[in-house]
Design a protein with these regions (language model features):
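A structural signal for multi-pass alpha-helical bundles of membrane permease subunits
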Residues: 40-322
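Transmembrane alpha-helical segments of polytopic membrane transport and secretion proteins
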Residues: 1-45, 133-135, 231, 313-322
């Protein structure tokens, strides 16, 4: 005969006390929160985390530290005092007219490069997405400059935009004097057009991939309603690739912020009179050539903060529009 005690239901432990099973489940939940749903993923991501820490986090932290000290490169084994100077390096950066000119140059670059990159890559991707003769050839030809070494393409552009080059000969008396890359007004716009042309292939590829995800039924419905090509493009294509447009814009802004190779090769590093220099080029010249890494680090930190602010504002605007 079953006793009354054996039939009595088991009561939960008093408040604040957990049974062995509950404690184990709680511990597992804490592990999942700390390491993710699958802790084994931490093992696979460890090499990438190490890569980020060594090549990005540590150099960035060191640059921030250097920017607050009077720092010089020395021979191995030589120890020199590196006093803390507070914001003195940042004050020197903000007071330097060459730095202000470099940021103005990048602003000019972005005003030209970003709209051109977005508009041309989207229009060309839309055209290449249609059924046209030699479509594969055109897709490949637009991608060739992107994978070609900058030294080779720069040589072509130096020839084209020289005083006796093809562009100047075609324009005749309308060509600027002095020629494009030694002209204070035209040096940076010419560099912006070159960077746009060279990077167009990868952005066309991004838009082509995005266009595959736009439902064809939307185009068919718009065509049935009598919408023109422009109306279909504005009402169907542009909203359908909005996320890629954000990505292309961000990549173009980052490209402008990191501009170095193009002015270094096309104008010899900022000529004429600093009108084609960039902040990264300024970092190289002051930090490496002139041995002022403290000044260069402060400039680099300001540049990183500026790019992060631009990216943050753009993300905020995108969320509000969505």
């Amino acid at each position: 005969m079953t006793s009354i005690a054996s039939r009595r239901p088991k009561l939960p432990p008093p408040s604040g006390e957990l049974g062995p099973g509950a404690r184990q489940a709680r511990a597992q939940r804490l592990v999942r929160v700390a390491l993710g749903r699958h802790p084994i993923g931490m093992i696979f991501s460890a090499p990438y985390a190490f890569f980020i820490a060594v090549l990005f986090a540590y150099p960035l932290g060191l640059a921030v530290w250097i920017s607050f000290h009077r720092y010089f490169f020395t021979a191995p084994g030589v120890s020199v005092p590196r006093p803390y100077v507070g914001l003195a390096n940042y004050d020197a950066v903000l007071d330097d007219p060459a730095v202000r000119q470099a940021f103005l140059n990048i602003l000019i670059f972005l005003v030209i490069n970003v709209p051109l990159t977005v508009m041309l890559s989207l229009l060309l991707a839309t055209a290449l997405n249609a059924v046209i003769p030699f479509r594969a050839f055109f897709r490949t030809s637009f991608f060739v400059p992107y994978v070609t070494a900058s030294v080779a393409t720069v040589g072509v552009w130096l020839f084209m935009f020289s005083s006796g080059g093809i562009i100047s000969n075609l324009l005749g008396p309308l060509a600027p004097h002095p020629s494009w890359l030694v002209n204070e007004q035209w040096a940076m716009p010419t560099i912006a057009i070159y960077v746009t042309w060279k990077g167009l292939g990868i952005f066309i590829l991004l838009y082509l991939a995005a266009l595959q995800g736009v439902p064809k039924e939307l185009y068919e419905a718009a065509e049935v309603d009598g919408a023109s090509w422009w109306h279909r493009f504005r009402s169907v294509t542009v909203p359908g690739v909005r996320q890629v447009t954000t990505l292309v814009t961000l990549l173009a802004v980052i490209t402008g912020a990191n501009l170095f190779t193009e002015p270094y090769l096309l104008t010899g590093g900022g000529a004429p009179n600093g009108k084609s220099t960039s902040p990264v080029l300024q970092i190289y010249e002051t930090g490496i050539e002139q041995n002022h890494p403290d000044f260069a680090s402060a400039l680099g930190v300001i540049l990183v903060v500026g790019v992060l602010l631009i990216v943050g504002i753009q993300q905020l605007v995108q969320r509000r529009q969505a």
